[in-house]
């Protein structure tokens, strides 16, 4: 039995299906043609961003298909001066969905590679927006969350490192060193807008999705706070020495990509594809100076933040990937053999949704 949606969510899903089938999928060829015009370094310039994506984003807003992922209402202080002229807000979704309801919309968006970004529901932005919405200060929300909610910028999440097994965040070696703590509150964030605490960030990250994008305005970076203690041992060292690894020093900070200490070393490829102009970068962080306003939630809260970010995001990724993969397989193998079987696609996609959940 297929999962039932409320009448409101069902109408939203039908509107989304029409948008994906009639606008996003036909635009994929135009998108690819534009990207094919660029080669080398110019693949990471603003000109390489296909105009089709901004056109689709504008259409999604007008259809009420914008920011569908949002799990909670947008704070009132962000909605000031955010009226589209018709009495509605451009950042808030047309309705707030449960995780199950949003999952069923993800399988619709997953049918087109353009639909998630067109609806402002693509990674890593969704996870970063959820973090800032749940844990960010008013300053962090106004400065970084608001442009993302409006679709004016992109972002990245920097966690994985080249020299360690980064699936265990206790292995991370990127260091956040506090150089002064004058005027710091109990939560470790500078008093009066973050003007007290000062930090220096050093390290190297890779597979940083979105960091190469010319629209990327900032990154959330997971780092270990330098407390003056020796670095935590690796898993192998832990076994040899018996010294336990710590888990309470990981901290998430906001780093502007325009900072002179931030350098995208190179784009990385997946099966030979660089995914320009979005991309997956190796990023060098050299003496990146930050103040207390860059710290999210406080020192040592990185695990808490990462769990709240990565949990729902993985489910959404599965929804997108299942249906995008099914569309490719059905086009190559299924429909040419059974050309009248397209009526079964919605049922099969629903079953994929159930399996993913």
Describe the residue ranges of each PLM region.
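Amphipathic, small/basic residue-rich leader segments at the start of a protein or domain
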Residues: 1-122, 143, 147, 185-194, ...
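Glycine-rich beta->alpha junctions and the first turn(s) of the following alpha-helix
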Residues: 7, 11, 264-346, 350, ...
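Short Ser/Thr-interspersed hydrophobic loop/turn segments at strand-loop and sheet-helix junctions
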Residues: 64, 105-110, 222-225, 255-262, ...
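N-terminal glycine-rich flavin-associated loop
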Residues: 117-139, 168
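A short, Trp-centered hydrophobic/proline-enriched beta-strand micro-motif
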Residues: 151-160
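Glycine-rich phosphate/pyrophosphate-binding beta-alpha loops
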Residues: 165, 206-213, 311-317
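A structural signal for short hydrophobic beta-strand segments in well-ordered beta-sheet cores
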Residues: 174-181
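A short core secondary-structure module
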Residues: 197-198, 202-265
